[in-house]
Protein backbone atom coordinates (compact mmCIF):
# COMPACT_ATOMS: atom_id res chain seq x y z
CA UNK A 1 0.00 0.00 0.00
CA UNK A 2 1.39 3.35 -1.09
CA UNK A 3 1.61 6.48 0.99
CA UNK A 4 -1.34 8.07 -0.80
CA UNK A 5 -3.55 5.06 -0.20
CA UNK A 6 -2.56 5.01 3.44
CA UNK A 7 -3.42 8.70 3.81
CA UNK A 8 -6.80 8.15 2.12
CA UNK A 9 -7.52 5.17 4.36
CA UNK A 10 -6.66 7.19 7.46
CA UNK A 11 -8.88 10.06 6.30
CA UNK A 12 -11.77 7.72 5.51
CA UNK A 13 -11.49 6.05 8.91
CA UNK A 14 -11.33 9.43 10.60
CA UNK A 15 -14.41 10.66 8.72
CA UNK A 16 -16.28 7.45 9.51
CA UNK A 17 -15.37 7.72 13.19
CA UNK A 18 -16.36 11.39 13.20
CA UNK A 19 -19.74 10.51 11.67
CA UNK A 20 -20.28 7.78 14.28
CA UNK A 21 -19.38 10.21 17.07
CA UNK A 22 -21.74 12.78 15.57
CA UNK A 23 -24.57 10.23 15.31
CA UNK A 24 -23.96 9.14 18.90
CA UNK A 25 -23.98 12.78 19.99
CA UNK A 26 -27.26 13.32 18.11
CA UNK A 27 -28.79 10.25 19.79
CA UNK A 28 -27.56 11.45 23.20
CA UNK A 29 -28.96 14.91 22.54
CA UNK A 30 -32.34 13.39 21.56
CA UNK A 31 -32.40 11.25 24.69
CA UNK A 32 -31.51 14.28 26.81
CA UNK A 33 -34.24 16.35 25.09
CA UNK A 34 -36.87 13.63 25.57
CA UNK A 35 -35.87 13.17 29.21
CA UNK A 36 -36.02 16.94 29.77
CA UNK A 37 -39.47 17.08 28.15
CA UNK A 38 -40.70 14.18 30.29
CA UNK A 39 -39.36 15.81 33.44
CA UNK A 40 -40.83 19.16 32.43
CA UNK A 41 -44.23 17.50 31.81
CA UNK A 42 -44.05 15.77 35.20
CA UNK A 43 -43.21 19.05 36.90
CA UNK A 44 -46.05 20.79 35.01
CA UNK A 45 -48.54 18.06 36.01
CA UNK A 46 -47.33 18.17 39.60
CA UNK A 47 -47.72 21.96 39.72
CA UNK A 48 -51.22 21.74 38.21
CA UNK A 49 -52.24 18.93 40.57
CA UNK A 50 -50.93 20.87 43.55
CA UNK A 51 -52.71 24.02 42.37
CA UNK A 52 -55.96 22.04 41.90
CA UNK A 53 -55.62 20.46 45.34
CA UNK A 54 -54.92 23.84 46.94
CA UNK A 55 -57.86 25.41 45.08
CA UNK A 56 -60.17 22.58 46.20
CA UNK A 57 -58.93 22.86 49.79
CA UNK A 58 -59.44 26.62 49.69
CA UNK A 59 -62.91 26.19 48.13
CA UNK A 60 -63.94 23.68 50.80
CA UNK A 61 -62.56 25.94 53.53
CA UNK A 62 -64.48 28.92 52.13
CA UNK A 63 -67.70 26.86 51.86
CA UNK A 64 -67.25 25.61 55.44
CA UNK A 65 -66.63 29.18 56.63
CA UNK A 66 -69.70 30.44 54.74
CA UNK A 67 -71.85 27.67 56.24
CA UNK A 68 -70.55 28.50 59.71
CA UNK A 69 -71.33 32.20 59.21
CA UNK A 70 -74.85 31.36 57.95
CA UNK A 71 -75.41 29.08 60.95
CA UNK A 72 -74.17 31.78 63.35
CA UNK A 73 -76.38 34.41 61.69
CA UNK A 74 -79.41 32.10 61.90
CA UNK A 75 -78.71 31.53 65.60
CA UNK A 76 -78.27 35.27 66.18
CA UNK A 77 -81.53 36.09 64.37
CA UNK A 78 -83.34 33.26 66.17
CA UNK A 79 -82.07 34.43 69.57
CA UNK A 80 -83.03 38.02 68.74
CA UNK A 81 -86.59 37.02 67.82
CA UNK A 82 -86.91 34.74 70.85
CA UNK A 83 -85.93 37.66 73.10
CA UNK A 84 -88.41 39.89 71.24
CA UNK A 85 -91.17 37.29 71.66
CA UNK A 86 -90.46 37.03 75.40
CA UNK A 87 -90.27 40.83 75.77
CA UNK A 88 -93.61 41.21 73.95
CA UNK A 89 -95.23 38.57 76.16
CA UNK A 90 -93.91 40.32 79.29
CA UNK A 91 -95.05 43.71 78.00
CA UNK A 92 -98.52 42.37 77.19
CA UNK A 93 -98.84 40.92 80.70
CA UNK A 94 -97.64 44.22 82.23
CA UNK A 95 -100.28 46.11 80.23
CA UNK A 96 -103.02 43.69 81.28
CA UNK A 97 -101.90 43.93 84.92
CA UNK A 98 -101.71 47.74 84.89
CA UNK A 99 -105.15 47.99 83.31
CA UNK A 100 -106.54 45.53 85.86
CA UNK A 101 -108.00 43.58 82.98
CA UNK A 102 -110.23 40.59 83.70
CA UNK A 103 -107.90 38.30 81.69
CA UNK A 104 -104.97 39.17 83.94
CA UNK A 105 -106.98 38.73 87.13
CA UNK A 106 -107.99 35.26 85.94
CA UNK A 107 -104.39 34.48 85.00
CA UNK A 108 -103.14 35.65 88.42
CA UNK A 109 -105.74 33.59 90.26
CA UNK A 110 -104.94 30.46 88.19
CA UNK A 111 -101.20 30.98 88.75
CA UNK A 112 -101.73 31.33 92.49
CA UNK A 113 -103.93 28.22 92.77
CA UNK A 114 -101.51 26.21 90.62
CA UNK A 115 -98.55 27.34 92.75
CA UNK A 116 -100.33 26.66 96.06
CA UNK A 117 -101.31 23.16 94.89
CA UNK A 118 -97.69 22.48 93.92
CA UNK A 119 -96.72 22.83 97.61
CA UNK A 120 -97.39 19.75 99.75
CA UNK A 121 -97.72 21.78 102.96
CA UNK A 122 -101.14 23.03 104.08
CA UNK A 123 -99.67 26.38 105.13
CA UNK A 124 -98.55 28.42 102.13
CA UNK A 125 -97.17 31.93 101.67
CA UNK A 126 -97.72 33.71 98.34
CA UNK A 127 -95.25 36.31 97.14
CA UNK A 128 -95.62 38.57 94.09
CA UNK A 129 -94.83 42.08 92.92
CA UNK A 130 -96.47 44.91 94.88
CA UNK A 131 -99.31 45.45 92.41
CA UNK A 132 -100.14 41.73 92.25
CA UNK A 133 -100.06 41.40 96.04
CA UNK A 134 -102.87 43.98 96.21
CA UNK A 135 -104.85 42.02 93.61
CA UNK A 136 -104.17 38.72 95.42
CA UNK A 137 -105.38 40.23 98.68
CA UNK A 138 -108.81 40.71 97.09
CA UNK A 139 -108.99 37.08 95.88
CA UNK A 140 -107.28 35.40 98.88
CA UNK A 141 -110.48 33.88 100.28
CA UNK A 142 -111.28 32.32 96.87
CA UNK A 143 -107.75 30.86 96.66
CA UNK A 144 -108.12 29.41 100.17
CA UNK A 145 -111.53 27.93 99.31
CA UNK A 146 -110.34 26.37 96.03
CA UNK A 147 -107.12 24.91 97.45
CA UNK A 148 -108.36 24.05 100.94
CA UNK A 149 -105.13 25.45 102.37
CA UNK A 150 -104.17 28.17 104.81
CA UNK A 151 -102.78 30.78 102.39
CA UNK A 152 -101.32 34.14 103.37
CA UNK A 153 -99.39 36.86 101.55
CA UNK A 154 -95.67 37.44 102.00
CA UNK A 155 -93.09 40.05 101.03
CA UNK A 156 -93.06 41.49 97.49
CA UNK A 157 -90.64 40.17 94.86
CA UNK A 158 -89.24 41.56 91.61
CA UNK A 159 -91.32 39.96 88.85
CA UNK A 160 -93.29 40.94 85.76
CA UNK A 161 -96.32 39.15 87.16
CA UNK A 162 -97.50 35.87 88.65
CA UNK A 163 -96.62 34.40 92.04
CA UNK A 164 -94.10 32.41 94.05
CA UNK A 165 -95.61 29.94 96.52
CA UNK A 166 -93.58 28.83 99.54
CA UNK A 167 -94.36 26.52 102.42
CA UNK A 168 -94.58 28.51 105.65
CA UNK A 169 -91.46 26.78 107.01
CA UNK A 170 -89.54 27.66 103.81
CA UNK A 171 -88.75 24.04 102.91
CA UNK A 172 -90.65 24.15 99.60
CA UNK A 173 -91.08 26.75 96.88
CA UNK A 174 -92.75 26.88 93.49
CA UNK A 175 -91.97 29.75 91.14
CA UNK A 176 -95.01 30.50 89.02
CA UNK A 177 -94.08 34.05 88.06
CA UNK A 178 -94.41 35.14 84.44
CA UNK A 179 -90.62 35.09 84.19
CA UNK A 180 -90.46 31.46 85.35
CA UNK A 181 -93.39 30.39 83.16
CA UNK A 182 -91.70 31.93 80.10
CA UNK A 183 -88.43 30.20 81.00
CA UNK A 184 -90.28 26.88 81.25
CA UNK A 185 -91.90 27.51 77.88
CA UNK A 186 -88.70 28.73 76.24
CA UNK A 187 -88.21 25.50 74.25
CA UNK A 188 -91.73 25.91 72.82
CA UNK A 189 -91.01 29.57 72.00
CA UNK A 190 -87.73 28.52 70.33
CA UNK A 191 -89.57 25.89 68.26
CA UNK A 192 -92.25 28.35 67.15
CA UNK A 193 -89.71 31.03 66.24
CA UNK A 194 -87.64 28.47 64.30
CA UNK A 195 -90.72 27.31 62.37
CA UNK A 196 -91.72 30.88 61.60
CA UNK A 197 -88.26 32.05 60.53
CA UNK A 198 -86.72 28.96 58.96
CA UNK A 199 -89.55 26.51 58.43
CA UNK A 200 -88.36 24.22 61.26
UniProtKB/Swiss-Prot annotation:
Topology versus the membrane: Peripheral membrane protein
Subcellular localization, as worded in the UniProt entry: Cell membrane
Function according to Swiss-Prot or TrEMBL: Component of the A-type ATP synthase that produces ATP from ADP in the presence of a proton gradient across the membrane.
Entries under InterPro entries matching the protein: ATP_synth_B-like_membr_sf, ATPase_E_C, ATPase_V1_Esu
Family: Belongs to the V-ATPase E subunit family.
GO cellular component assignments: plasma membrane; proton-transporting two-sector ATPase complex, catalytic domain
A GO molecular function held by the record: ATP binding
HAMAP family found in the cross-reference section: ATP_synth_E_arch
Protein name per the record: A-type ATP synthase subunit E
Keywords: ATP synthesis, Cell membrane, Hydrogen ion transport, Ion transport, Membrane, Transport
Native organism: Methanopyrus kandleri (strain AV19 / DSM 6324 / JCM 9639 / NBRC 100938)
Main location: membrane
SUPFAM superfamilies reported in the protein's UniProt record: F1F0 ATP synthase subunit B, membrane domain, V-type ATPase subunit E-like
NCBIfam families, sorted: PRK03963.1 (NF003049)
GO annotation, biological process: proton motive force-driven plasma membrane ATP synthesis
One Pfam family here: vATP-synt_E
Subunit structure, interactors included: Has multiple subunits with at least A(3), B(3), C, D, E, F, H, I and proteolipid K(x).
